[in-house]
Amino acid sequence: MKLKYSLFLIFIISILGWNFYNCCEEINVEINERNFLVNNERYFIKGVCYDPVLLGSKKRSFDKIDEDLKLMVEAGVNTIRVYSPIDDTSILDKIDKAGIKIIVGFGYNQEGYYDILSGSFENYIKKYKNHNAILLWELGNEYNYHPEWFEGDINNWYEALNEAAHKIKQIDSSRPVTTAHGEIPDKTLIKKLDNIDAWGINVYRWDDPSDLLEEWLNISEKPLYLSEAGSDSYMTIEKYGYSKGENQLAQADANEKILDVVFNNSDIVSGILIFQFVDGLWKAGNPDKQDIGGWAPNSIGVPYDGAPNEEFWGIVDIERNKKKTFEVIKNKYNNN
């Protein structure tokens, strides 16, 4: 009888503990002019985009989360941006314990996985809105480049985006709602999307986003963060003294210059997420090996060849070996 009673008490305590954690964990993210405040202190995003897919796979996996978090902490990362929600309390708890916060991204049509189209994103917010690791709710990822996903009319996306943001505010008033836009939006769109509290911008303007920051200063008073920025570690052509082929120096140099611009303009921008933490070998061909793949040279503003080789963007490689840019980011994030 005593054993049964003890087990019953343990069960009750565990349930109460779980409810206490989910109900009473306090985090409040506010906006003050162009800044994010976490529990009344300014929070400057020093982040990486995080989409960990293992060698030989095409699906996200957190099997290496412990190793990854250790590397992130060493690099001074305080924020990760994920492209779809993490539905695993144990993973969220590990991220929180590491002192890292999450920008949770929701897609429009993810076949019902916490997406906007089905409305299931609301269930995720209800489930995890009190988790200390979550910094921002982010809707979409540069969908403005893809009107074909919205019956050929990008305004269909903007309407869905603004409505989804409104629904989030009804569920969780403790965090801002953002979106990740491809390049800078115009003033009219910012005004139209009045439920968006802050803007993330995916920006690839060579190694100098300073013009974009000045543009933002003139069109909006809302907080801005660079939701994607950076460079890959492969040169499709020889250019500017950087040799063709894998070139970690080119990546390191570009990221250093980009980060300098961000930290030197911290009165305008509220942070940056370097794209990305680990190489994605699933993107351009055989997921069992690293493939060269990207657009033709000079077709986009990616330093220093204009070609975004999709499988070479990590600050670490697929085996978690540090690239040269890792030390650059570590220095900048830990000393700013």
Model region roles, listed by residue range:
Residues 275-336:
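Aromatic-rich peripheral "rim/lid" segments of glycoside hydrolase catalytic domains that contact
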